[in-house]
Amino acid sequence: TNNHVVEGSSTLTVTFIDGKSVKADIKGTDSDKDLAVVAGPLSEIKDSTMDKIAVATLGNSDQTQVGDQVIAIGNALGYGQSVTTGIVSAKNRKMNDEGIEQDEDSDATNLIQTDAAINPGNSGGALLNMDGEVVGINSAKLASTEVEGMGYAIAISDVTDTLEQLMNETPRDKVDNHGVLGITGMSVSDEASQYYGVPEGVLVSEVTDGGAADKAGI
């Protein structure tokens, strides 16, 4: 699911297709990529419910083409599970967490743009290709409020490694996985190293008082 879905939640519940629910815990989150993995204890899931659960197959979002048909699954507006259909409108879109488009060279997560309706409640749901494979994770947080037909999903192939890492973490209370070093600095290239006569690495220009770097004596 998305990090912004679970962010700030005191309790989590997973509801299955048969209406049965179990309490869930967070296994891991990545706020930069807006990803989260939650887990429900198998001991609390009845066999009758397990029989109805189908494991999603991950597709290759790199192979999707503009114009391909896709299906978005979610819980739009909290009314229950629903699906919408559309096409891949564009690939390799990049936006920051405020929905502002970024340059192609940006470190922002790769997004698939689609005209399939992605409304509040669809966040964290799957964007499927016509083979039923997951090619994206829908994010209503990035949906445009100014125009219609512009929804976004996180390209699954770009975040598979991150999801694997989060899945292997131990269930816990939510914490931010990203630490803060507490410096302002710049990389020192080989060319800059020779020009200024300083070692390669990172040049620290400022240290935040009381930050981790300050406490470490940097």
Language-model regions: role of each:
Residues 1-192, 199-200, 209:
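Serine-dependent protease modules
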Residues 213-218:
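Conserved PDZ fold ligand-binding element
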